[in-house]
Amino acid sequence: MEEEEVDGIPVNEFGRLEIDFDYGFDFTGIVTPPVSTDYDVTLYAKLGLYCYNFQKGTNLKFVRWEKYNTSTGTAYIDNYITLEAMDPSCNSVFSFQTVFSAAGCYNQDTYHVQDWRVLACRPTCGKSVNEYFDRHEAMDPFYTGKIPKWLSDDALAFDNKKYYVVQESDLHENDWLLVFMEMVFLQENPELKVSPPLEINKVVVETKEDYITEAREKLHAENAIFYISYKYTGVSSSDHKAIIRKTMDGVPEHMSLEIALVK
């Protein structure tokens, strides 16, 4: 088969431009602040940082995004984001880059599921991006089948080693849970331009594996399912539910978040 090209650049089998890391981030259509619709970019950047912190054991904090550009195909939108991150341990600020992808959606029973992926997350460098996410070969089938139904109280009481009910103290220590919640609300309300007033009601984490020492270990599992109920506290306040399946395929800098909105 003859290789396709876009503006003289080869396109690989996944429909993405075969470009090196720096060129991918500065290829075309670069957007810089201030813009009025940057809330989504901020969330994407924070999720890239979360993936890096999770895999590296660091605690980098988001400062601001500097620029981004997008690459689109028939089934995906890749956002190449350059941001400033801070290391609180030494108060140093440095350039960081992440690729955050809207990797497609599907319908399952009453759910509409969107698959979001981090395909790169690291301090700025010139390495290429591995955009192939191998969900089925690298993962236990427990995390690749259908999104489970909303967790009932009976199920939670029946097998409490399988689940962990997140405590208030966990929310303070794991502020990425709030980012997960905001990402859910953004998926439901893609027109959002600023951070909405939201409050978590309850989060339950499920893993196939039992915990070793304490149940809160499930918060730090590579693969896990989160049942999140929360409240929008703005005008016309409302309650919301979502299921998030977080998976990693064993490739550094990769993470998938499948988000199912529960009606």
Indicate residue ranges for each PLM-predicted region.
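N- and C-terminal low-complexity/disordered segments
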Residues: M1-K263
